[in-house]
Amino acid sequence: MLPFKTLALFLLTAVAEIVGCYLPWLWLRQGRSAWLLVPAAASLALFAWLLTLHPAATGRVYAAYGGVYVAVALVWLWTVDGVRPGPWDWLGVSVTLCGMAIIAFAPRGG
């Protein structure tokens, strides 16, 4: 799979997972409507389906996806929660994304 397509799929997958977890959090912690569980379930189903679109071995996909998830969660923290990440947050996500790139795009023998 091409690197751009892989990254786009990882980004979409991360957003689906975060939305699927954030909506129940709103219901449980902020007293929002239980109807939020309906789009949350749909979002988590989309998340699971998106994971199946990656051609690599499942464990490798999960490991590489985890790096993108960390980056998207940090952006979510900033844009949705209104908490600006600090320099250590950005350094941590940079290291994580380097690891993701190695796992996802390193040449594989055989």
UniProtKB/Swiss-Prot annotation:
Q: Which InterPro entries has this protein been placed in? A: UPF0060
Q: Name one GO cellular component term.
A: plasma membrane
Which SUPFAM superfamilies does the record match to this protein?
A: Multidrug resistance efflux transporter EmrE (SSF103481)
Topology relative to the membrane? Multi-pass membrane protein
Report which superkingdom the organism of origin falls in.
Answer: Bacteria
Listed A to Z, the keywords are: Cell inner membrane, Cell membrane, Membrane, Transmembrane, Transmembrane helix
Q: Where in the cell is it found?
A: Cell inner membrane
Q: Where are the transmembrane segments?
A: 7-27, 33-53, 63-83, 86-106
Which family would the database say this protein is a member of?
Belongs to the UPF0060 family.
Q: What is this protein called?
A: UPF0060 membrane protein Dtpsy_1668
